[in-house]
Amino acid sequence: MKRTPTAEEREREAKKLRLLEELEDTWLPYLTPKDDEFYQQWQLKYPKLILREASSVSEELHKEVQEAFLTLHKHGCLFRDLVRIQGKDLLTPVSRILIGNPGCTYKYLNTRLFTVPWPVKGSNIKHTEAEIAAACETFLKLNDYLQIETIQALEELAAKEKANEDAVPLCMSADFPRVGMGSSYNGQDEVDIKSRAAYNVTLLNFMDPQKMPYLKEEPYFGMGKMAVSWHHDENLVDRSAVAVYSYSCEGPEEESEDDSHLEGRDPDIWHVGFKISWDIETPGLAIPLHQGDCYFMLDDLNATHQHCVLAGSQPRFSSTHRVAECSTGTLDYILQRCQLALQNVCDDVDNDDVSLKSFEPAVLKQGEEIHNEVEFEWLRQFWFQGNRYRKCTDWWCQPMAQLEALWKKMEGVTNAVLHEVKREGLPVEQRNEILTAILASLTARQNLRREWHARCQSRIARTLPADQKPECRPYWEKDDASMPLPFDLTDIVSELRGQLLEAKP
C-alpha cells in the first residue's frame, strides 16, 4: 500500500523542483579554501559553523577514537539502514550505529534507532565483547570532550553577539585565543548553553566509496559525489548544537600540485557542504575534512542551513554527537505510557480475560492511541532491524519482551471494548460514542500492520543478511488461540464502520 506523502514532504519536494527549474542547466556557485573570498563568505553567511583542526585535539584522544572506530567495524557493528522516504524503502549507502544514554532512541527518515549504551555513571551494562565495551566508553569520552568544546564555542558566540561583533572564530587551531564571557553573561545563559550541548547520543557513520559506485551527484552546485544528500538533522532539541569528529582512513590527505589548478573541490578528499536553505544567491561552501578534524553546527544553523557530505576516495568514519529530542523517545517514556493505558484494566480478574474500569470514550481513545504507539513506534521499529543489536549488547532484550507483554495486554483491552460495543442493551448513543472514539486508531492499526508486513516482505528486505533481515513482529496466524484478536483487522474495522453509518440519521 503506497503511503500518501505528508504536506511537509510535498512542500519540500515542490521547493526542490522549483529550485532545479530555476537553475536549468547552470550550477550555483560554491567556494572552497582555494577561493579568495572563501573565508570572508564563511564569516558573513555561515558564522555559526566552526571547524576545529585535528591539531587542536590530543594525540591520545585521536588514537583512542580511531581505534574504537576500527574495533566496531571489525566486529560488524555498523549497519546500513532500510529507511522509508516518500513511501519507498531505500538502503542507505552509509553504515551506522547509535551509541548513547541507556534507553535512548533517535529517529531519522522514519526509522527509530536504539542506542547501544555507553557506560554512564551508575549503569550496569553488558556488551558482547570487552572490545565493544571499551569502544563505547571511548565515544563517551569523546562526547565529554566535544561537549566542553561546544560550550566554549557557544560562550564565544554569545559574547561576540552581545558585543555586536559580526564574526566568530572559523578555524580554531590549538593556539586560538579564548574569548571569555562579558559582564552581561548571566547564570540563565550558562544553563541554556549547557543544555544545548548536552549530547545524549552519537550516530556513528562509515562508508567506503570504492564499494559504492552508484553514489548520487550533488544536484545544485556540481560538487561531485555525495555520501549523504542535502538535509537538516532531524529529531533534535531546538537550537541545540551538533558536533562531528571526522576520520578518513589512510589516503591522499593533501591536494597534489597537479590538482591546484582544478576548479571546485578535490574529489579525493572528503568534504562537508553547506548552503542556506532554498537560497540561490549565496554561494555554498565545501569544507575539506582531514583526518581528525571536528566541526560544530551551533545554535539555529541546522534549521537555517542544509548540509551534505561529499565523498572522497578513501573509507571514512564519523561520530556525530547530538542532543536528541527524547521527550517521546526513551524506554522510560514508553513504559509510562503503557502504564497509563493499562490503568483502565481491573487488577482483580483471575483468568486471562481483561475487564475494564471505564468505557468513557476519552479513556478508550487514549488507550487505543497508546496501543498504536507501542506497536508501531517501538516493537515493529525494533524488530524491523532484525537482530542487529545483539551483535553489541543484550541490553534491549528484556525491555522489548516487557513492552511486548504490555502490548499483548492492550490487545485484550481492545477485545474487551469490542465486546462492550456488541453488548445487548447498550444505549445506541453510548455505542456510537465508543465507536467514534476507537475507530480511527483501529483503522490506522490495520493500515500500518499491512504496510509493515509488506515492508518486511519487500525484495530489498530479502537481500539483507540473516541477522539484519526484518522480522514482522508481533505477528500471528488466525488460529492462534493465545491472541484475543486477529492480526488482520479488516473485517472488524469494516463492521464497526458499518455500525456507525447505520446509526447516523
Curated annotation (Swiss-Prot):
Record-listed N6-acetyllysine modification sites: 216
Top-level lineage group: Eukaryota
InterPro entries: AlkB-like_sf, FTO, FTO_C, FTO_C_sf, FTO_cat_dom
Pfam families named in the record: FTO_CTD (PF12934), FTO_NTD (PF12933)
Positions that bind 2-oxoglutarate: 205, 295, 316-318, 320, 322
Tissue localization of expression: Ubiquitously expressed, with relatively high expression in adrenal glands and brain; especially in hypothalamus and pituitary. Highly expressed in highly expressed in acute myeloid leukemias (AML) with t(11;11)(q23;23) with KMT2A/MLL1 rearrangements, t(15;17)(q21;q21)/PML-RARA, FLT3-ITD, and/or NPM1 mutations.
Fe2OG dioxygenase domain as annotated region, ranges: 32-327
Positions of the UniProt region annotated as Loop L1: 213-224
Entry note: cofactor: Binds 1 Fe(2+) ion per subunit.
Required cofactor(s): Fe(2+)
Outcome when changing residue 234 to P: Abolishes enzyme activity. Abolishes ability to demethylate N(6)-methyladenosine RNAs (m6A) RNAs
Residues annotated to bind Fe cation: 231, 233, 307
GO biological process: adipose tissue development; DNA alkylation repair; mRNA destabilization; regulation of brown fat cell differentiation; regulation of lipid storage; regulation of multicellular organism growth; regulation of respiratory system process; regulation of white fat cell proliferation
pH and activity: Optimum pH is 5.5-6.
EC number assigned by the record: 1.14.11.-, 1.14.11.53
Subcellular location: Nucleus; Nucleus speckle; Cytoplasm
Modulation of this protein's activity: Activated by ascorbate. Inhibited by N-oxalylglycine, fumarate and succinate. RNA N(6)-methyladenosine demethylase activity is inhibited by fluorescein derivatives. RNA N(6)-methyladenosine demethylase activity is selectively inhibited by meclofenamic acid; inhibition is specific to FTO and meclofenamic acid does not inhibit ALKBH5. Specifically inhibited by R-2-hydroxyglutarate (R-2HG), an oncometabolite that also exerts a broad antileukemic activity.
Domain notes: The 3D-structure of the Fe2OG dioxygenase domain is similar to that of the Fe2OG dioxygenase domain found in the bacterial DNA repair dioxygenase alkB and its mammalian orthologs, but sequence similarity is very low. As a consequence, the domain is not detected by protein signature databases.
Function in brief: RNA demethylase that mediates oxidative demethylation of different RNA species, such as mRNAs, tRNAs and snRNAs, and acts as a regulator of fat mass, adipogenesis and energy homeostasis. Specifically demethylates N(6)-methyladenosine (m6A) RNA, the most prevalent internal modification of messenger RNA (mRNA) in higher eukaryotes. M6A demethylation by FTO affects mRNA expression and stability. Also able to demethylate m6A in U6 small nuclear RNA (snRNA).
Protein name: Alpha-ketoglutarate-dependent dioxygenase FTO
UniProt organism field: Homo sapiens
